[in-house]
Amino acid sequence: MDPFFLNTQHVELLVSGKQSSPQDLLGIVSESLNQDRIVLFRPGAETVFVELRGKIQQAESHHSGIFSLPVMKGISPQDYRVYHQNGLLAHDPYAFPLLWGEIDSFLFHEGTHQRIYERMGAIPCEIDGVPGVRFIVWAPHAQRVSVIGDFNGWHGLVNPLHKVSDQGVWELFVPGLTAGACYKWEMVTESGQVLIKSDPYGKFFGPPPRSVSVVIDDSYEWNDSEWLEERIKKTEGPMNIYEVHVGSWQWQEGQPLNYKELADQLALYCKQMHYTHVELLPVTEHPLNESWGYQTTGYYAPTSRYGSFEDLQYFIDTMHQHGIGVILDWVPGHFPIDSFAMSGFDGTPLYEYTRNPSPLHPHWHTYTFDYAKPEVCNFLLGSALFWIDKMHVDGIRVDAVSSMLYLDYGRYAGEWVPNRYGGRENLDAIRFLQQFNTVIHEKYPGVLTFAEESTTFPKITVSVEEGGLGFDYKWNMGWMHDTLHYFEKDFPYRPYHQSDLTFPQWYAFSERFLLPFSHDEVVHGKRSLIGKMPGDAWRQFAQLRLLLGYQICQPGKKLLFMGGEFGQGREWSPGRELDWELLDISYHQGVHLCSQELNALYVQSPQLWQADHLPSSFRWVDFSDVRNGVVAYLRFADADAKKALLCVHHFGVGYFPHYLLPILPLESCDLLMNTDDTRFGGSGKGFREPEILTPEIARQEREAAGLIEADDESGPDCWGLDIELPPSATLIFSVTLQ
């Protein structure tokens, strides 16, 4: 045989498991002008048979597992198949051309490949009419990369990939494989260590702890075209989000509902409760239940805990058909240290940020991503685009943005390295977030992005062109913390904390805000929403109804974590369902009905959501009554509107048959909502017809009440509104201004 085929260096590298270019030795090799030779590598095999154009022939055996068969010139990969030791008859992987091209390489290493999810990982495809799976992975520091699985006995020498570029992309087409095949990567590092890794670009995984990657065939037939076409029109509409953890919303026979079971039930529930969107705690694959999904190992894969890849597509499709948008929690800020996943992927910190003395984030004991590497940014960008394109999600909420923006987040002096200007901002992360928002908004108009960001970093929701990060909305963590801090105070102490309610209005229009009562506020000893409220049971439920009304009335989009809408008593736990049996108790029924009607009023009232990021949508009426804990304001749909909503919140426990508010001149005032309604479990007060008082009469009433002296010329010369004010309640009036 021609010595070329037994080139000592090639064979030694192949047998030792360090061959980076098996395609140079294996497959169809030209032997002469008239003859080719099929060269095969079957470690451990004594004989190998080849089916060549319908005839079975035995290949010649050489040393070290090398076999070959001389064939006529011009044979094609489709002309022969090889018998494997398990009896499988399949085409030769090394006879097919490599498809990773120069454009792929340029875009990926530049960090701008917008369809990388169709190129990396395990992609079912046909090459020259032969079906199979194309495997591609980025591992620049590996000596050898193999795909292992049931199809090759998990033997790392059988299917080594070919290194198609000096920048570390490896590829192999394995004919005959279909959806459902399990696989992992086996790598030999520069030091010779053998690593077994799951696929960072894997689209599905087996359950922990095995965590094998699974080939999927994305063939779901969607039925939501009408929703997608109309989606862009909904971006300026009402947004009332129900935050859901899939595994603990509702159980059946001791197990969480799967994606399909959940779909119809949750869609109908959201419609009944007038939620416009659901936001899912991460359904990306993750090894630890207790992480709630926030320690992700499968950035392109729905978790298998609740069903298949197609089942989640069905869930989202069903939500859309019921008119409910789907927002995904997504974690590009850090990833877990589990050795089977991305950490030390090719024997080096490939995805990890390493410039700090300790690579681990002090808050979560996880690795942060290195946004200076274009390939890492492309991995993350591709993940977001995958969920929008292949799973039809309508929004992406980026978790822990603050930890991405600041190099010193959670770290003390000496534990972090400043940027090149000596500052603490992570300039690479800022560029990535700008790229993320720019690409999504250009490619998918109508898809929304949300930032969970807890600092005063400027311009979170300002466009990238104007120097901002480009998010659509920022979670207003300050409003949430101040509001809950106030509500947790017992009633005698609230007058000293009125600024918790008024201060957020100073910055309420500095960004486009979303007002969350999220899962983070009902765990780890923080107590449930109802558990935060002071007083006896009646007062606690009255305060919860007041809180829900306060959130609905405030400027900004809305988010409520599941269970808050009916007064879940226990803290949330991912290991059990919500306490739905509480809905058999009248107090909880009342809160549930109150929440439902508040939501309905919200989505039907443009004053509560139209232009709610503009100062013109809000006007104070009065916040001076600190002693009684009363604040009132007007909400407008546009600056010139005569129609408005008057929102009055009484945070105290007193009852006022006649309470006088200073007000602009009114033509009419009608009560729309009273959270003290007996139907909600309230006292039934506050339903007296409001009286509009002229300035003269209003002044007389103030004098009679001792609010001003009779000869006081500095007193307010304004109209008044005499209302019945119930204890611990939100009142919402429809008013027409003169």
Swiss-Prot record:
Assembly and partners are described as: Monomer.
One GO MF term, please? 1,4-alpha-glucan branching enzyme activity
Organism of this sequence:
Chlamydia trachomatis serovar L2b (strain UCH-1/proctitis)
Task: Name the GO terms of the biological process aspect.
Answer: glycogen biosynthetic process
Q: Which gene encodes it?
A: glgB
* Tree of life domain: Bacteria
> What Gene Ontology terms describe where this protein resides (cellular component)?
cytosol
Q: What is its EC number?
A: 2.4.1.18
Q: What is this protein called?
A: 1,4-alpha-glucan branching enzyme GlgB
State what this protein does: Catalyzes the formation of the alpha-1,6-glucosidic linkages in glycogen by scission of a 1,4-alpha-linked oligosaccharide from growing alpha-1,4-glucan chains and the subsequent attachment of the oligosaccharide to the alpha-1,6 position.
Q: Which residues form the active site?
A: D399, E452
- Keyword Manganese tagged: no
- Record-linked InterPro entries: A-amylase/branching_C, Branching_enzy, GlgB, GlgB_N_E_set_prok, Glyco_hydro_13_cat_dom, Glyco_hydro_13_N, Glyco_hydro_b, Glycoside_hydrolase_SF
Catalytic activity annotation:
Transfers a segment of a (1->4)-alpha-D-glucan chain to a primary hydroxy group in a similar glucan chain
Q: What SUPFAM superfamilies is this protein classified in?
A: (Trans)glycosidases, E set domains, Glycosyl hydrolase domain
Q: Which family does it belong to?
A: Belongs to the glycosyl hydrolase 13 family. GlgB subfamily.
**According to its UniProt record, in which pathway does this protein act?**
Glycan biosynthesis; glycogen biosynthesis
Swiss-Prot/TrEMBL keywords? Carbohydrate metabolism, Glycogen biosynthesis, Glycogen metabolism, Glycosyltransferase, Transferase
